[in-house]
Amino acid sequence: MSKEETLYSVKVDQERVPLFDEDFYKGFRSELSVRFTMAALDPRAKSNDAVTVNVITRLEHPEEDGEESDEELFQEEKFTLCTLKKGSVYQQPIDIIFSPGEEVFFERVGGDIPVYLSGTCIITNIPEEEDSSDLENDFLYGADEFSSDEEEMDDISVTSSEEEEEENGARIEELNSDEEDAEQAEEEILEKPVPKDEVAEKHSKDKLKKEEKEKKTAVDVSDSVNGKKRKTEPAGEGEQTEKKSKSTKTYPKQVLEGNVTVQDKVKGDGPAAKRKKRVSMRYIGRLTNGKVFDKNITGKPFTFNLGLEEVIKGWDVGIVGMQVGGERTIHIPAAMAYGSKRLPGIPANSDLVFDVKLLAVN
């Protein structure tokens, strides 16, 4: 794991200023930490009144039993960062770090003077192997952590076809092995001599088995007439098989505006995402080399108004038409993403790939 730092500053000139401006990261939350080391007044300001900068943090507080509720609870905390005054205290050294996941705002109180907070943006680079492991554990199996139909997600289909074939092959071999063991055990039992005092009991059991076999044969014959073959399954196994068959169905790729390409992995059955609707999403963002640069797979879903340029153009185009419960892969050309702008973890002129799932439409 490596780290790199870039210069970063915030101008506090309103009552409530966010840590990250929307234009800085276009609605996507990044795995970034920010450390501020200096607060300074604008020397051109005319006001001589003292000005105070407060910090407001908004942290998520899950319920005591560890499960998330339908409406997640949040609590705001406020504290004073510094107080400056023109003519006496133009700047003040500070040392404060905001970690990834914190929702932070700055509040200006007092004089009508802009205050500049400066420092560094700390970027943590996670090795691909470690990131891939986290992705498999959280993204594929994170569904058990959510209970709400609107805000919780099933596991997203990101397993490759080769892995599915290997898994299916392993299961087939295991089933064949179990059947061979059962047949061998049955042959061994038949070969063992039966004591005379057990002959009557065995005869009774054999008679019951014969009757059961005749009943089963009758059922199989009845099903064969309708072109079906019944198979005894444990409770719930049929539903799981149907769900897996649905998730592995292949849908055609579609080329949309700006050469944005989408391919559905799972078709949803809920309300459809339309322009000007507010949607809640889970997602994993990758570069074309497979490296993950951003993701939202746990906690509060990523929510925005579709088609109103609150996110990159590729999302406004690629999400339209999805239904709640649906999963989709979106390939976005650089021109429909961040273009020539370089962002933490995203080189300039990068094509992006997103695996997304639609949780809710409001």
Curated annotation (Swiss-Prot):
Domain of life of the native organism: Eukaryota
Keyword annotations of the record: Isomerase, Phosphoprotein, Rotamase
Compositional bias (Acidic residues): 146-167, 175-189
RNA-binding among keywords: no
GO cellular component, as recorded: chromatin; nucleolar chromatin; nucleolus; preribosome
Biological-process GO terms, alphabetical: chromatin remodeling
Catalytic activity, EC: 5.2.1.8
Region (Disordered): 144-274
Catalytic activity entry: [protein]-peptidylproline (omega=180) = [protein]-peptidylproline (omega=0)
Residue ranges occupied by any PPIase FKBP-type domain in the UniProt entry: 276-362
Entry's Gene Ontology molecular function annotations: peptidyl-prolyl cis-trans isomerase activity
Residues bearing PTM Phosphoserine: 69, 177
Biased composition (Basic and acidic residues): 190-218
InterPro entries found in the cross-reference section: NPL, PPIase_dom_sf, PPIase_FKBP_dom, PPIase_Fpr3/Fpr4-like
PANTHER family in UniProt: 39 KDA FK506-BINDING NUCLEAR PROTEIN, FKBP-TYPE PEPTIDYL-PROLYL CIS-TRANS ISOMERASE FKPA
Biological function: PPIases accelerate the folding of proteins. It catalyzes the cis-trans isomerization of proline imidic peptide bonds in oligopeptides.
Similarity comment: family membership: Belongs to the FKBP-type PPIase family. FKBP3/4 subfamily.
Protein name per Swiss-Prot or TrEMBL: Probable peptidyl-prolyl cis-trans isomerase C27F1.06c
Organism: Schizosaccharomyces pombe (strain 972 / ATCC 24843)
